[in-house]
Amino acid sequence: MAKRDYYEVLGVAKNASDEDLKKAYRKLAMKYHPDRNPDSKEAEEKFKEAKEAYEVLGDEQKRAAYDRYGHAGVDPNAAGMGGGMGGGFADAFGDIFGEIFGAGRRGGGGPQVYRGADLKYALEITLEQAASGFDTEIRVPSWENCDTCHGSGAKAGTSPKTCRTCGGSGAVRMQQGFFSVQQTCPTCHGTGKEITDPCPSCDGVGRTRRNKTLQVKIPAGIDDGMRIRSSGNGEPGINGGPPGDLYVEIHIKQHKIFQRDGDDLHCELTIPFTTAALGGELQVPTLGGKAEISIPEGTQSGKTFRLRAKGIRGVRGSYPGDLYCHVVVETPVRLSDEQKAILRQFEASLNDGGDRHSPQSKSWTDRVKEFFS
């Protein structure tokens, strides 16, 4: 199935600002996060789709490539991409028109140089860790140059031979009608070399799979879906090409109490109906400890209390967000006969006072009467 337009996925215009893109992605990520939709395959696919769209549009270079060439401009499997953003359509057209106008392919005089592939690492952290920031150690599986042959792929005491198919250029030219198209050599795969006596440690590949340990600094205020770039810690390049980068993608675990919305936090505040009716002082949790709020008499379910600066200070924020406590009035259950009798007596006393004790109920009753009149 064809991919949807990334701007359409995020629901933004093509001239959307970075902040608009971030807000749109955050909204979709919260809505379709697997933790909130544990049994929904559709939600999981929408979460992945939004994540993929933001990874492209949130990166200046990738967005420019996407705006110009569409999905092909950011597809790492597209011809000429070489693991980075430097190839793609520019290389493809260079191959075709270079033969006509005399322009050579980039690096066309010898083996093709490739940038190493980027790596991604998903790191799950708690909301508390995201708020305060911390240093951590991660182990990343990646390809590294073989210690025995130092990346050559040849057995010790020997060296790779010049590829007989491409003559060491790493590329061959194919005639297609009026055009001569340059393609990666099928024999040496662009290296320009053939391994006749392979290294026993890596079987001639020149690289081995291993885990490397890295120190990563998680900044305070980081949000779900954000990425930390570790330059040069991706896979090694080919033929002397630069290494790729490592991107640590942050996933924040669902919290038992708080839900995050940008720099603000939200929580449900359950109070007994007696406190709702009579008022009182309550302690509420915050990420920094406990805070006290005053519950006024006659508080109803749905009322929201705002505690300023009790949210999270964002990565680029000057001030912390707020904490919003949403009141839920709890109805008592499993009452004894004596308690039921007391409540019935209490209800009778309220009825004697008319509607003044239940303003919302009176308003609702009036609306129902008006609806049926």
From Swiss-Prot:
Cofactor binding note of this UniProt entry: Binds 2 Zn(2+) ions per monomer.
Database matches in SUPFAM superfamilies: Chaperone J-domain, DnaJ/Hsp40 cysteine-rich domain, HSP40/DnaJ peptide-binding domain
Keywords: Chaperone, Cytoplasm, DNA replication, Metal-binding, Repeat, Stress response, Zinc, Zinc-finger
Single Gene Ontology BP annotation: chaperone cofactor-dependent protein refolding
Record: residues binding Zn(2+) 2: C163, C166, C185, C188
A Pfam family recorded for this sequence: DnaJ
UniProt zinc finger (CR-type) residues: 133-211
Predominant location: cytoplasm
One cellular component term from this protein's GO annotations in UniProt: cytoplasm
Gene3D superfamilies: DnaJ domain, Heat shock protein DnaJ, cysteine-rich domain, Urease metallochaperone UreE, N-terminal domain
Cofactor(s) it depends on: Zn(2+)
Residues in J domain copies: 5-70
Cysteines paired by S-S bonds: none
CDD domains: DnaJ, DnaJ_C, DnaJ_zf
Record flagged with keyword Repeat: yes
Coiled coil feature spans: none
Subcellular location as annotated: Cytoplasm
MF terms in GO: ATP binding; heat shock protein binding; unfolded protein binding; zinc ion binding
NCBIfam families: DnaJ_bact, PRK10767.1
Family in the record: Belongs to the DnaJ family.
Purpose: Participates actively in the response to hyperosmotic and heat shock by preventing the aggregation of stress-denatured proteins and by disaggregating proteins, also in an autonomous, DnaK-independent fashion. Unfolded proteins bind initially to DnaJ; upon interaction with the DnaJ-bound protein, DnaK hydrolyzes its bound ATP, resulting in the formation of a stable complex. GrpE releases ADP from DnaK; ATP binding to DnaK triggers the release of the substrate protein, thus completing the reaction cycle.
Entry comment, domain topic: The J domain is necessary and sufficient to stimulate DnaK ATPase activity. Zinc center 1 plays an important role in the autonomous, DnaK-independent chaperone activity of DnaJ. Zinc center 2 is essential for interaction with DnaK and for DnaJ activity.
Description of how the protein assembles with itself and partners: Homodimer.
Protein name, entry field: Chaperone protein DnaJ
Organism: Bordetella bronchiseptica (strain ATCC BAA-588 / NCTC 13252 / RB50) (Alcaligenes bronchisepticus)
